[in-house]
């Protein structure tokens, strides 16, 4: 039997985590032969509720689940971990400006970055789900200087999956036929879902759709606004779909992307595609051996470049507002 992998999940008593933890314990993320130890973090007032979640996990009798720790201390939660899924974040409340949300969450992720730096395994893989995810990931990374920058990522996979579904519906094919979707930039309404390189059963998606008006006024805005539409429909934000995206993101990062396909991940920019260093930016990547690599040499249209730069400018604006929290 393999050595158990230690997985930390923050915001562990919350809605996304409730859809996430049982799937991790069942082997959906790391495989059906990989034991796991869950190290769960939440704020003190949520620990009674979290104890109930742990009771449910116990009652599932998952063969792969070796142990569970619950705590309100980041250092306890992150000690010797291999994977961190930073789900917990302060939600935006009525009347709250985005800069106030950035500040409130920046303080949380600064502390978590410092704790990761001090006690996490040196090979740790960190996925930030809590919004604003890209900038929260950047704050976490900058406060963990002893860890490799490539250890940090933010979640673009929910946007990616949404884009795959919308394209599949448009062309009347199953989602399994869609490959090479990209969502560039920030996980926000400035993101750029790009189907210009996507394929449906090996055929170029843009050629199949053959409708630039739909791409510009249908496809792109639908993906950008989908999260808000979910909130309006169910009264709360995406939870099960976000948890599923987190599972997909980490599974592919650890085990590799399928042959002939790529995925979208928020990662530290390195100058690729004209995006300067200094932000966590959504890129198309392939994963192998636990490492990701940006897909090189894609042709970028003027329309795409304009959208990509707009998302970059938004990220730079976010970074400017929290620069005092960067280590």
From Swiss-Prot:
Keywords: NAD, Oxidoreductase, Tricarboxylic acid cycle. This is Malate dehydrogenase. GO terms for molecular function: L-malate dehydrogenase (NAD+) activity. Disulfide bonds: none annotated. Substrate binds at residues 92, 98, 131, 162. CDD domains: MDH_chloroplast-like (cd01338). It catalyses: (S)-malate + NAD(+) = oxaloacetate + NADH + H(+).
């Amino acid at each position: 039997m393999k050595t158990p992998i230690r997985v930390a999940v923050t915001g562990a008593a919350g809605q996304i985590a409730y859809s996430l933890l049982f799937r991790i314990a069942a082997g959906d993320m790391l495989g059906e032969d990989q034991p796991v130890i869950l190290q769960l973090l939440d704020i003190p007032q949520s620990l009674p509720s979290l104890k109930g979640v742990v009771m449910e996990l116990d009652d599932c009798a998952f063969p792969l689940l070796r142990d569970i720790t619950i705590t309100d201390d980041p250092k306890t939660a992150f000690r010797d971990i291999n994977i961190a899924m930073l789900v917990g974040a302060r939600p935006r409340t009525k009347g709250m400006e985005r800069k106030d949300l950035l500040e409130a969450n920046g303080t949380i992720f600064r502390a978590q970055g410092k704790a990761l730096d001090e006690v996490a395994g040196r090979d740790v893989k960190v996925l930030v789900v809590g919004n604003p995810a890209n900038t929260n990931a950047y704050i976490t990374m900058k406060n963990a200087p002893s860890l490799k920058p490539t250890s940090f990522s933010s979640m673009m996979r929910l946007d990616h999956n949404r884009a795959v579904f919308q394209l599949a519906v448009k062309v009347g094919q199953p989602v399994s036929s869609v490959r090479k979707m990209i969502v560039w930039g920030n996980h926000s309404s400035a993101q750029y879902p790009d189907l210009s390189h996507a394929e449906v059963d090996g055929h170029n998606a843009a050629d199949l759709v053959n409708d630039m008006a739909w791409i510009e006024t249908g496809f792109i805005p639908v993906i950008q606004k989908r999260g808000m539409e979910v909130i309006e429909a169910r009264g709360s934000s995406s939870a099960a779909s976000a948890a599923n995206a987190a599972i997909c993101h980490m599974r592919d990062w650890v085990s590799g992307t399928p042959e002939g396909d790529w995925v979208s991940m928020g990662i530290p920019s390195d100058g690729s595609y004209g995006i300067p260093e200094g932000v966590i930016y959504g890129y198309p990547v392939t994963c192998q051996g636990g490492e990701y690599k940006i897909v090189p040499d894609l042709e970028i249209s003027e329309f795409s470049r304009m959208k990509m730069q707009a998302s970059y400018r938004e990220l730079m604006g976010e970074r400017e507002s929290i620069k005092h929290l960067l280590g």
